[in-house]
């Protein structure tokens, strides 16, 4: 299921400890400073 994450609380299809939602279903670690990851976190 989707979980809320990121500053704006957008829902994301993947979950990881401290994640930011960029585009739908795309997450990146909150420590990442460069754009969004193209990989999915489970």
Curated annotation (Swiss-Prot):
Answer yes or no on keyword Repeat: no
Coiled coil regions, renumbered to chain: none
InterPro entries attached to this UniProt entry = Conotoxin-I_CS (IPR013141), Toxin_19 (IPR012624)
Gene Ontology MF annotations? sodium channel regulator activity; toxin activity
Q: Which GO terms describe its cellular component?
A: extracellular region
Name which cysteines form disulfide bonds.
5-19, 12-22, 18-27, 21-36
Keyword field: Disulfide bond, Ion channel impairing toxin, Neurotoxin, Secreted, Toxin, Voltage-gated sodium channel impairing toxin
Q: Which PROSITE patterns match?
A: I_CONOTOXIN (PS60019)
Q: Does the keyword Endoplasmic reticulum apply?
A: no
Expression sites by tissue: Expressed by the venom duct.
Compartment list: Secreted
Name the domain of life this protein comes from: Eukaryota
Q: What does this protein do?
A: Iota-conotoxins bind to voltage-gated sodium channels (Nav) and act as agonists by shifting the voltage-dependence of activation to more hyperpolarized levels. Produces general excitatory symptoms.
Give the family per the record: Belongs to the conotoxin I1 superfamily.
Show the domain comment.
The cysteine framework is XI (C-C-CC-CC-C-C).
UniProt name for this protein = Iota-conotoxin-like R11.16
List the source organism.
Conus radiatus
What is the taxonomic lineage of the source species?
Eukaryota, Metazoa, Spiralia, Lophotrochozoa, Mollusca
């Amino acid at each position: 299921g989707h979980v809320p994450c990121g500053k704006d609380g957008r829902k994301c299809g993947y979950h990881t400890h401290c994640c930011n939602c960029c585009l739908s279903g795309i997450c990146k670690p909150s420590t990442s400073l460069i754009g969004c990851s193209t990989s999915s976190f489970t």
